[in-house]
């Protein structure tokens, strides 16, 4: 399985047989990053804000999943967990859907714009192999809450997302605060400039590892 980072909260998952899923594609005019133009079998949308649901650069035919669902796309099993975009159960920013995938035997979760440490989500995801985790705060959990959420889930690998870069057109927290939280917890930090994580090649660590991915460019 390969996991490619398209920037902001967008990723492409590719199974060994070539089945593809794109999570949370964004409006590049709103975000400030260049959203790669791509084909895919499935698009998942955690919630309908323009930095998570813009399919302008998705070409060809695909299935769009934006609600509670349990299904499969060829060799990828897909499930959902309903949660909230904020700590007031959606009163501020509405709902959020966590999408989970089983790809080549690897359990992966995209947490969308989760806004608080939700015990229901923690219980459902505990022991997952990989989580894609927002860390920038303002509209999601901040660095400290993200670290608390990750520690409770205890995945093998965390891939940070939804954090400030020099290209962003709106202000959220940067990656550095989350890296500081992760380092304080003794987690391994892998930041080698890669844009793709090959899960079958990931080393088995005694502690959780944080993998920082660069934006993928076709």
Where on the chain are the PLM-derived regions?
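Active-site-proximal beta-strand elements of phosphoester/diester hydrolases
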Residues: 2-5, 20-24, 77-84, 98-100, ...
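Binuclear metal-ion centers of metallo-dependent hydrolases, dominated by the metallo-beta-lactamase
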Residues: 4-6, 93, 157-218
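Internal catalytic or translocation cores that form aromatic/hydrophobic pockets or channels
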Residues: 8, 18, 27, 154-163
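Pre-active-site segment of Zn-dependent metallo-hydrolases
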Residues: 9-48, 52-66, 82-96, 114-124
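Structural motif
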Residues: 21, 42, 106-108, 130, ...
């Amino acid at each position: 399985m390969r996991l490619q980072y398209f920037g902001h909260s967008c990723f492409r998952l590719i199974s060994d047989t070539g089945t593809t899923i794109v999570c949370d594609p964004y409006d590049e005019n709103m975000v400030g990053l260049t959203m790669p133009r791509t084909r895919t079998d499935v698009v998942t949308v955690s919630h309908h804000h323009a930095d998570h649901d813009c399919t302008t650069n998705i070409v060809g035919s695909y299935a769009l999943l934006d609600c509670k669902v349990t299904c499969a796309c060829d060799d990828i099993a897909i499930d959902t967990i309903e949660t909230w975009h904020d700590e007031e159960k959606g009163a501020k920013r509405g709902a959020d859907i966590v999408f989970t995938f089983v790809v080549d035997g690897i359990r992966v979760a995209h947490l969308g714009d989760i806004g608080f440490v939700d015990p229901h989500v923690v219980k459902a995801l505990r022991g997952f192999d990989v989580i894609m985790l927002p860390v920038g705060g303002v509209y999601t959990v901040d660095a400290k809450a993200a670290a608390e959420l990750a520690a409770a889930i205890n995945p093998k690998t965390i891939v940070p997302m939804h954090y400030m870069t020099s290209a962003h057109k709106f202000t959220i927290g940067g990656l550095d605060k989350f890296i500081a939280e992760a380092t304080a917890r003794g987690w391994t930090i892998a930041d080698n400039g890669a844009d793709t994580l090959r899960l079958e090649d990931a080393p088995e660590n005694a502690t959780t590892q944080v993998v920082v991915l660069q934006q993928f460019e076709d």
